[in-house]
């Protein structure tokens, strides 16, 4: 700064460097400093450091002060500094920075530590704090409430806020270093503990918060399963070893916060047994709290309990066996024991013994008894039955027509049947209606059919006029049952399956059936024959048949019908052989003319009188064929078939042409008759039309006259009405125009009135705003001048006013003048009274004496 005169305001300072000694000093305001030639001002006047209340700042390289607080100077007159050190200064009067001092931290508000909070501090240097010695590296807490005064030897690590521990909560802590907790207990490094005290907890300096643990709410239906991580005492002061497990229930605590030495395995739900329920607990816990491995305990309802650690249910919650009179249980002893029955008799049961209890009774099996099966009486009609096998002897028998309950030494036996028999025994298959269903079609129908119960006695309803053969393998005999009848198979009996030929021509094994229909019925076959002139023909024939059983009570006679299993195929082959032999000796023309007679003679044969017999009987199975029906005769050779077809077509054409000629003649006759009737009707219609036209002309003339009279009258009336309406309209129009003019005039007057009122209001409001604006501007100007004067200060204004004359006086003193008068041409000087003024006589007193 090159100015010679430097004005230092109050609370400002400058640093002046003496260039001769190279020593800097400080000059504080308020003062006017005149710089010497050998001095240099290092910077313009700068405001002193001001620290507001409850603030602080940090000064680097502070000056050394004596006991009285004054700066210590060295031999050169320069302030001595503590280089590299820092000093914290609190609220005080504004102070300057001495040469070499630096403001390390500007004024900063002191940190207010509230209640339930603290500052984590660490010592950087060794020092003493209120008689307590701190070593570098020490850590401690400054707890609130209070205001923390910082020190240069201490660094703040972080804020620590208290953690609120609510009801049913706990705070899990761990020691970072050997320390003493809030309760005065010594903790080693790494030790963990739990704080359950409700309220705010401020962790210590060496305490680390791991987690806030919520309590487990215990109810009557929920318990807590715990495991000890180390030897510890539980809430009942019972010592728990490492790995030991136990339960905490509602009877011990409503809410439980597990400790650090305890691990929560899970929550256990209550096991509730109804009045008719029970359960078997495996490995139950004894009175000493230890599990009894390998043992069982039966718990009966009504009861609620928790499964202890290590316990589990054998088969869950089971229902008590409530047996009626028709029910029972098959039991087996798993170990030796004694029991009493209802009569008081003692029974010694050995392992493996089987017995059965019957109702009515409510039974809960003990741990020494195993329930093998549940038995109930099987209701059977007189046509129903079951197969029962004795477990001791192995015999199987059928029980039919009575309700039966299996004993402890019996079981249901399943009778297996061949798959084809099972398919034919389905309830929805009727032997009569499905007699023409082939085996491939039957296979598709079997899908989705409910399977037969193999323990039930096999039954088959034989339809009317049918027979079934039952074979007994144990007796090696067969019996035939004629319908209508119900067949019930014994344990060693099987049904005979018939495999019949089917299709056209017949193929073996197409139709399967359990019953043999006795007829009458028919079957159809297709055979190929050859005449004497080598014409090959294909015949489709149908045969009516039935079985002739004279005495159904005779076993030999009844068994004959089953002697030939495929009676259809055998009969068709025999009849086809007869027909081919008979036709081979006949010409085609003869066969074409007499086919029916030739075929009947070939099938039934001739009697001694050369007459055709009435039937054909097969003696081996009593099959009787009664008639032959020729469905079609077709040549096998293509040329023969074409020639026959042409002849048939020619005959058809001749017949058709004759019918067409007759139809044309009849159509021509009918056409002539229709034309005559049409012409006659046309003449009659013309006469009727002329008569109607004459009547129409008469009516038109009358209508024209009436129309003329009506038009004239209507025109006159309309003109009169129009004149009347026009006059009324003119009057109404004049009235409306007058009303419109009045409304328009009133509206214009009202508009002008409102416009003048609005204009007057606008001018008044504008004048008011102008006055208000002028008043506010004057107030602002006066307030600005007042605040400016207050800001500058009276002393400053006086100094500004006196600075000019004082400077002039000093200038005159420098020139050696005792007094002087400086004026300009615009200010006159009274020289007459100047001498009196120099003598110090007031002008007014001199004038007063002169007047006297």
Curated annotation (Swiss-Prot):
InterPro entries: Band_7/SPFH_dom_sf, MVP, MVP_rep_dom, MVP_rep_sf, MVP_shoulder, Vault_2, Vault_2_sf, Vault_3. The keyword Hydrolase does not apply. It holds the Pfam family MVP_shoulder. GO terms for cellular component: cytoplasm; nucleus; ribonucleoprotein complex. It comes from the Eukaryota. MVP repeats lie at residues 2-54, 55-109, 110-161, 162-214, 215-269, 270-320, 321-377, 378-457, 458-520. The vault ribonucleoprotein particle is a huge (400 A x 670 A) cage structure of 12.9 MDa. It consists of a dimer of half-vaults, with each half-vault comprising 39 identical major vault protein (MVP) chains, PARP4 and one or more vault RNAs (vRNAs). Required for normal vault structure. Vaults are multi-subunit structures that may act as scaffolds for proteins involved in signal transduction. Vaults may also play a role in nucleo-cytoplasmic transport. This is Major vault protein.
């Amino acid at each position: 700064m090159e100015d010679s005169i430097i004005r230092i305001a109050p609370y400002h300072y400058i640093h002046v460097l003496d260039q001769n000694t190279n020593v800097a000093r400080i000059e504080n305001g308020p003062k006017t400093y005149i710089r010497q030639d050998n001095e240099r001002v290092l910077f313009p006047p700068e405001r002193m450091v001001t620290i507001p209340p409850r603030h602080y700042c940090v000064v680097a390289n502070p000056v050394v002060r004596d006991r009285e607080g004054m700066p210590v100077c060295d031999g050169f007159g320069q302030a001595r500094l503590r280089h590299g050190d820092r000093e914290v200064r609190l609220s005080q009067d504004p102070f300057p920075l001495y040469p070499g001092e630096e403001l390390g931290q500007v004024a900063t508000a002191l940190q207010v530590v509230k209640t339930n909070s603290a500052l984590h501090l660490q010592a950087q240097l060794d020092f003493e704090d209120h008689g307590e010695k701190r070593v570098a590296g020490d850590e401690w807490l400054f707890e609130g409430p209070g205001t923390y005064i910082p020190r240069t030897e201490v660094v703040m690590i972080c804020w620590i806020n208290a953690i609120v521990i609510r009801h049913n909560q706990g705070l899990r802590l761990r020691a970072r270093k050997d320390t003493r907790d809030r309760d005065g207990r010594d903790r080693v490094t790494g030790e963990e503990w739990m704080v359950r005290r409700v309220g705010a907890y401020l962790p210590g300096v060496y305490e680390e918060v791991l987690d806030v643990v919520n309590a487990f709410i215990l109810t009557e239906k929920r318990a807590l399963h715990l495991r000890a991580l180390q030897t510890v005492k539980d809430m009942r002061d019972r010592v728990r070893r490492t790995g030991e497990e136990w339960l905490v229930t509602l009877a011990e605590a409503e809410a439980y916060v597990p400790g650090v030495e305890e691990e929560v395995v899970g929550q256990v739900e209550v096991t509730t047994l109804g009045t008719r329920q029970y359960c078997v607990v495996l490995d139950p816990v004894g009175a000493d709290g230890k599990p009894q491995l390998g043992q069982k305990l039966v718990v009966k309802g009504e009861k609620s309990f928790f499964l202890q650690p290590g316990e589990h249910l054998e088969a869950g919650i089971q229902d008590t066996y409530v047996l009626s009179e028709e029910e029972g249980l098959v039991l087996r002893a798993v170990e030796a024991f004694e029991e009493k029955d209802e009569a008081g008799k003692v029974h010694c049961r050995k392992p493996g013994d089987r017995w059965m209890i019957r109702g009515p009774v409510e039974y809960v099996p003990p741990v020494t008894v195993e329930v093998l099966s549940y038995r109930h009486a099987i209701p059977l009609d007189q046509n129903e039955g079951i197969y029962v096998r004795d477990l001791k002897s192995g015999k199987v028998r059928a029980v039919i027509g009575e309700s039966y309950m299996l004993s402890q030494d019996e079981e249901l036996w399943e009778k297996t049947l061949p798959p084809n028999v099972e398919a034919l025994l389905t309830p929805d298959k009727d032997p009569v209606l499905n007699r023409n269903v082939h085996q491939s079609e039957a296979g598709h129908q079997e899908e989705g059919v409910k399977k037969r119960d193999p323990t039930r006695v096999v039954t088959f309803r034989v339809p009317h006029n049918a027979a079934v053969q039952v074979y007994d393998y144990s007796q090696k005999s067969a019996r035939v049952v004629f319908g209508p009848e119900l067949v019930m198979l014994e344990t060693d009996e099987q049904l005979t399956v018939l495999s019949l030929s089917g299709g056209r021509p017949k193929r073996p094994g197409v139709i399967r059936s359990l019953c043999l229909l006795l007829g009458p019925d028919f079957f159809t076959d297709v055979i190929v024959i050859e005449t004497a002139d080598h014409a090959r023909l294909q015949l489709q024939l149908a045969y009516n048949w039935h079985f002739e059983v004279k005495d159904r009570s005779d076993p030999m006679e009844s068994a004959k019908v089953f002697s030939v299993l495929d009676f259809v195929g055998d009969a068709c082959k025999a009849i086809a052989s007869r027909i081919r032999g008979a036709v081979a000796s006949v010409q085609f023309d003869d066969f074409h003319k007499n086919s029916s007679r030739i075929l009947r003679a070939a099938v039934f044969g001739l009697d001694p009188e050369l007459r055709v017999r009435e039937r054909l009987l097969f003696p081996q199975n009593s099959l009787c064929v009664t008639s032959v029906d020729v469905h079609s005769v077709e040549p096998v050779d293509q040329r023969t078939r074409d020639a026959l077809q042409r002849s048939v077509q020619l005959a058809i054409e001749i017949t058709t042409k004759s019918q067409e000629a007759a139809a044309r003649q009849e159509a021509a006759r009918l056409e002539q008759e229709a034309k005559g009737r049409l012409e006659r009707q046309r003449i009659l219609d013309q006469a009727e039309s002329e008569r109607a036209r004459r009547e129409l002309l008469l009516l038109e003339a009358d209508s024209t006259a009436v129309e003329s009279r009506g038009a004239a009258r209507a025109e006159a009336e309309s003109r009169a009405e129009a004149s009347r309406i026009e006059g009324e309209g003119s009057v109404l129009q004049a009235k409306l125009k007058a009303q419109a003019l009045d409304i328009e005039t009133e509206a214009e007057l009202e508009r002008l009135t409102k416009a003048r009122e609005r204009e007057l209001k606008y001018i008044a409001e504008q004048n008011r705003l102008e006055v208000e604006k002028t008043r506010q501007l004057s107030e602002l100007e006066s307030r600005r001048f007042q605040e400016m004067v207050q800001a500058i200060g009276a002393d400053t204004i006086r100094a500004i006013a006196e600075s000019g004359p004082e400077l002039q006086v000093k200038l005159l003193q420098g020139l050696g003048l005792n007094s002087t008068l400086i004026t300009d041409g615009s200010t006159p000087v009274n020289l007459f009274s100047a001498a009196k003024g120099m003598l110090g006589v007031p002008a007014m007193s001199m004038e007063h004496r002169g007047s006297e």
